[in-house]
Amino acid sequence: MRAIIIGIGQCGGKIADIFSLVDFEAIAINTSRGDLEYLKHIPQDKRILIGESIVGGKGVNANPVLGREAMKRDLPMVMKKINSMVGYEDVDIFFLTFGFGGGTGAGGTPVLAEALKEEYPDSLVVAIGALPLKEEGIRPTINAAITIDKLSKVVDSIIAIDNNKLKESDEDISQAYERINYTIVERIASLLALIDVPGEQTLDASDLKFVLRAMGSFATVGYAKADAEKVKSLSRLIIRSFENEGLYLDVSLESALYGLVAIHGPPEVLKAKDIFEALNELTQRIRGKQIFRGFYPDPRERSVEVVTLLSGIYESKSIEDIILTAKKYAREFMKAKEEGEAKKRELLSGLPDFDDVYSGEESEG
């Protein structure tokens, strides 16, 4: 299976950079020259500066309108670089990594996603977006809500990562984001690494594409891992991967249409009874009742790893909270703006023009 990672903006570029570290094809797009220079693993010729004529390489200061315009203006250059990267070999999935709360990512990702769908109709376009932390304030929340709306109309799936679930209580924001970015890559890379790999029951690219072709709805990744010697109940470990503690987004499991589960570990631990017991529970709980599964016994392994992908999700408390907060703020902002404009008009009404005050006076000198 061939996947290309495209990082848009600061957050997306950092995530794509980690994907590049673990040997994925990756490219970074940004309005900030400094952010592109900060990257460590993506080759220089795979770093694209956009919007230079608009912001001069200094970024868009979390303004998605500028991010959108930068992507639109330089879209031919971006697509030319991507086309060169694709070459003559088909791409199964384009993963667009970005931060929902930023400017370049939030504004530019929907523009690029639409262009990719038109240029590569047989490839999936999947957004991987990090939801803003609550500590970041209202502006990132507004950006996230609007971007969710726009992306849902153009991508196949949105894998949303709720940073509030992954952040540890004693971390500051910068520490949290660095660890979260590595966590995102580790989990998704673990899943992709098992596609088209021989196993007792295998997952292939068509399985993954079927699950992710979900009409712009949400998807989430679940994960559970334990030392093989400490696994007393394999079924419980598998169930943990798709329950709230293992998922990256607060979702209603019952609203999911599709599921995909990959299990990797020593053969003596991967007992069929435990596996099917857990998968039967997942099948009963999700609305779509369709589960794709892969079992990968490996005598070299000393741990058991379970990666779960749920898609076709339309109910998520994480998403609902962001959208409701954004709507509330938008109403309050528009009301305050209208009241302010009304007070300004009232205050300034009745003032004369210069011509009224100075009419008839002769100029001196």
Curated annotation (Swiss-Prot):
- Gene Ontology BP annotations: cell division; microtubule-based process; regulation of cell shape
Keyword terms = Cell shape, Cytoplasm, GTP-binding, Nucleotide-binding
Has keyword Transcription regulation?
no
The protein, known as: Tubulin-like protein CetZ
Question: InterPro entries from the entry?
Answer: CetZ, CetZ_C, FtsZ/CetZ, Tubulin/FtsZ_GTPase_sf, Tubulin_CS, Tubulin_FtsZ_GTPase
What are the protein's GO molecular function terms? GTP binding; GTPase activity
List the PROSITE patterns hit by this protein, alphabetically: TUBULIN
Q: Which organism is it from?
A: Pyrococcus abyssi (strain GE5 / Orsay)
Q: Which domain of life is it from?
A: Archaea
Q: What does this protein do?
A: Involved in cell shape control.
Assigned GO CC terms? cell division site; cytoplasm; microtubule
* Entry keyword annotation includes Thylakoid: no
Compartments, record wording: Cytoplasm
